[in-house]
């Protein structure tokens, strides 16, 4: 791992805030694409409604001065350049596809919170040392094509691209055909895109934060059926004449792996938000990103813990709070200049 993107304490940015009204308006605007009678959203992956949602988010990104790259599984990366474009970008996002009877916030919040970070930096006329990218991944939900977290899984090398293209829905339409139909099969090979660190803001999809009156959940892990022991292997060298930048130092890398969680906790504390550690009971694209780069997740409460449902709801105050934490964390890694 390059020492160029190791955690660096930021300038004092505690007073900086995202525009909560703008973020809320964007969430409500995107939710109109595929809106359901009960106030939810039905925007299945790689349908025309998905195309409309993608077009809208990309339009907003371009208005914010961002460049756009699409890979061969339809993952979309929107980039705000850094002062040092050679550094791997600090990336944040989620997904915009929904369940058949889904809500306004699942996935969409993570993408638009990340976009709001960029808009806020533009408002403040703040440049960053490292580039910042907003991503939305293809088919996180798995409600039309199986498996879930498809786009991030292909990106991480978990699912072979050509095999994934061949997966069909119940009508016999393949992923590859659907990508072609909506015009979102890009040129970049999935995975040929560096990531310095990855952060994902998300509704909790459970009742714990609301029950305990906590504003921020600092995600410690995602439940699964596999457990891993992580062994970081370095190379011994004389401590005196070998500078840190030329070492293969195992402790340095292991420390970096832990810093994302610490950064989120620190940001929540500095902003004065009640927070607690939490484990995610649902899967997220951040799982596969953790295979590739240091990764963190920020949870906010959702009413009654309800998600994957048309009545899914998060308050404007919590939506803004999570995005403010995301702003602080991304700045600690992208480094304002």
Show where each model-derived region lies:
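N-terminal capping segment at the start of a domain
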Residues: 2-47, 308
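A generic, well-ordered mixed alpha/beta core segment in the N-terminal half of proteins
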Residues: 98-171
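Zn-dependent metallopeptidase/amidohydrolase metal-coordination segment
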Residues: 21-36, 93-94, 275-324, 333
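His/Asp/Glu-rich mid-to-C-terminal helical/loop segments that flank catalytic regions of hydrolases
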Residues: 238, 242-264, 300-337
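Catalytic-core environment of secreted peptidases
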Residues: 64, 76-109
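Acidic, glycine-rich active-site loops and adjacent beta-strand->loop/helix elements
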Residues: 74-76, 96-98, 132-143, 205, ...
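Midchain, well-structured core segments that form catalytic/ion-binding scaffolds
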Residues: 139-140, 144-266, 270
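A non-catalytic alpha/beta surface segment that caps or lines the substrate-entry region
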Residues: 35-81
């Amino acid at each position: 791992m390059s020492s160029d993107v190791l955690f660096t304490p930021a300038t004092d940015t505690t007073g900086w805030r995202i525009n909560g009204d703008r973020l809320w308006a964007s969430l409500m605007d995107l939710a109109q694409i595929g809106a359901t009678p009960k106030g939810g959203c039905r925007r299945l992956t790689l349908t025309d409604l998905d195309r409309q949602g993608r077009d809208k988010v990309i339009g907003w990104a371009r208005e914010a001065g961002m460049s756009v790259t699409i890979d061969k599984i339809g993952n979309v990366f929107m980039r705000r350049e850094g002062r040092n474009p050679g550094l791997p970008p600090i990336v944040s996002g989620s997904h915009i596809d929904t369940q058949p009877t889904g809500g306004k916030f699942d996935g969409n919040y993570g993408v638009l919170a990340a976009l709001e970070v960029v808009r806020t930096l533009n408002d403040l006329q703040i440049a960053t040392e490292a580039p910042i990218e907003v991503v939305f991944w293809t088919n996180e939900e798995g409600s039309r094509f199986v498996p879930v977290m498809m786009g991030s899984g292909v990106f991480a090398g978990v699912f072979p691209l050509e095999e994934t293209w061949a997966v069909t829905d119940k009508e016999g339409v393949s992923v590859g055909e659907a990508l072609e139909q909506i015009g979102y099969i890009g040129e970049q090979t999935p995975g040929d895109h560096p990531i310095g660190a990855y952060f994902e803001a998300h509704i909790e999809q459970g009742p714990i934060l609301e029950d305990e009156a906590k504003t921020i959940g600092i995600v410690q892990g995602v439940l699964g059926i596999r457990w891993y022991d992580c062994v970081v292997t370095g190379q011994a060298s004389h401590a005196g004449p070998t500078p840190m930048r030329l070492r293969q130092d195992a402790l340095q890398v292991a420390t970096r792996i832990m810093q994302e969680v610490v950064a989120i906790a620190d940001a929540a504390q500095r902003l004065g938000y009640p927070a607690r550690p939490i484990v995610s009971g649902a899967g997220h694209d951040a799982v596969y990103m953790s295979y590739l780069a240091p990764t963190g997740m920020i949870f906010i409460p959702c009413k009654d813990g309800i998600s994957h449902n048309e009545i899914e709801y998060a308050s404007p105050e919590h939506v803004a709070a999570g995005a403010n934490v995301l702003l602080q964390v991304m700045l600690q890694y992208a480094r304002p200049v």
